[in-house]
């Protein structure tokens, strides 16, 4: 990491936490705030999808560069500034070992360096970042490039947990890494219960479910029934209010008991009818309110008055 990166937005997660938010300063509720959530910039997918070769295609990503630049510009214009900008995985399209991976990574870093230095980045690993069947080597590459693959941090009395959801999809080549995350997660959820934090929020790439906890296994876009139910019950027991994810390239989601599952569409390639966009998430003492904006809407109009009123409420 260069000195410029160290002093800029790349406050990479290390030691399972995010130095941008010191726990000793952020453990108490201080009033409403908001953050921006994006997913799947996935440099290269638009071309790969258009040619029908998602495994090997993706040799162009100019569209994704322009879209991500538009997202960054829209975020930088916001006032007040968001507490952070989280990207929920699939940062690039080229899987580990595939052509163009290095070039896509460098181009995304270049675009993200333009994020206002006062807005830390929170980076979540996706299946394209570490592979559909991750290995110790692919996870290590992600950690070296972008920071820890799972970690927690506090902002104003709210506990945020970032998970590596690929460990729940296929940990067959790195079972010990999956076990380590499981143990860590249990410890973090225990802290959430004991501390009675204002809210607890989870970020992961693959959704628990797309609409319902009881939906069929999709074998790609959701976690298996047994895995999702086990995780969701753990989250609910610890008081987690909402899980945010990407991966689906469409907006979706549902509720299981008192746990909201929010699936946010992509900055990059759309697989449904949603526009390229970002989600504004407002955290108040009582609730978590979120709204998806197209990049054009957020660029031209900013955040709507009703959300701004919540942010400014004392």
Swiss-Prot record:
Pfam families: Metallophos (PF00149). It is an enzyme of class 3 (hydrolase). Its EC number is 3.1.3.16. The gene is CPPED1. It catalyses: O-phospho-L-seryl-[protein] + H2O = L-seryl-[protein] + phosphate; O-phospho-L-threonyl-[protein] + H2O = L-threonyl-[protein] + phosphate. The modification Phosphoserine is found at residues 2, 294. GO terms for cellular component: azurophil granule lumen; cytosol; extracellular region; plasma membrane. This is Serine/threonine-protein phosphatase CPPED1. It comes from Homo sapiens. InterPro entries: Calcineurin-like_PHP_ApaH, Metallo-depent_PP-like, MPP_CSTP1, STPP_CPPED1. GO terms for molecular function: metal ion binding; protein serine/threonine phosphatase activity. Binds 2 divalent metal cations. Residues 47-250 are annotated as: Catalytic.
